[in-house]
Amino acid sequence: MNITAIIPARFASTRFPGKALADIAGKPMVQHVYERTARARLVSEVVVATDDDRIAQAVRGFGGRVEMTSRDHETGTDRLAEVASRIGAEIIVNVQGDEPLIEPAMIDEAIAPLAENPAVRMGTLKSRIRTLHDFLSPNVVKVVTDLEGYALYFSRSPLPFFRDKWNDLKDESFASGRLLCYKHVGLYVYRRDFLMEFAKMPPTALELAEKLEQLRALENGCRIRVVETAHESIGVDTPNDLEKVLEKLK
């Protein structure tokens, strides 16, 4: 089975321009993501998708494969679909280009349900929420799943609402495991044919309200398999996030 991981990488970024090329221990960030992704056991090939010549040159410089894409894409999924349309992979993995500490095992965990069950068309990850701050933060996307591990909903709001415990919530409630709730980890796996369908679907009401593209799949009746991971990663959205990554690598 051909499983290709695609890393969308843009130079433009509102909060951290050029972050894909930010230096981390002598390598650009995109190289760290590429090399860690290539170590995933189930991944056959890794490709960087970009519309920027500087990023393309950097990727070629470390021997990576790069595919140039249109500058007109509104979402990362559109960029992903453009590259997927050119390659013969059966399964496409979308690895965020700003996750330089991503664990290869996380990628394998997300792929496994699609590799094992042809009925699964889309998959992603979740991890335990361990602080009250994360539970309440709109920047931490929450997910709830059914008993078979399929997503019921994703939201920036606290989810679920613990009606009887709301006034007593504190960090210890989450750290101890007494309250089990989960944050979404933004790594996606698609069957190629579904990705091509998904990219053509118009934005949906809940997607636009929450600014969460995966809700488009749910609103169109696609079941999303969500696997719990014990691994953690750090997304680099700001220079401050980069400092956290550098601290971890010391």
Swiss-Prot record:
EC number: 2.7.7.38
Annotated signal sequence range: none
A Pfam family matched in the record: CTP_transf_3
Key word Phosphoprotein present: no
Highest taxon of the lineage: Bacteria
The keyword Cell wall biogenesis/degradation belongs to this UniProt entry's keyword annotation: no
Cellular location(s): Cytoplasm
Reactions catalysed: 3-deoxy-alpha-D-manno-oct-2-ulosonate + CTP = CMP-3-deoxy-beta-D-manno-octulosonate + diphosphate
Keywords from the named record: Cytoplasm, Lipopolysaccharide biosynthesis, Nucleotidyltransferase, Transferase
Function: Activates KDO (a required 8-carbon sugar) for incorporation into bacterial lipopolysaccharide in Gram-negative bacteria.
Similarity remark: Belongs to the KdsB family.
Protein name in the entry: 3-deoxy-manno-octulosonate cytidylyltransferase
Organism of derivation: Geobacter sulfurreducens (strain ATCC 51573 / DSM 12127 / PCA)
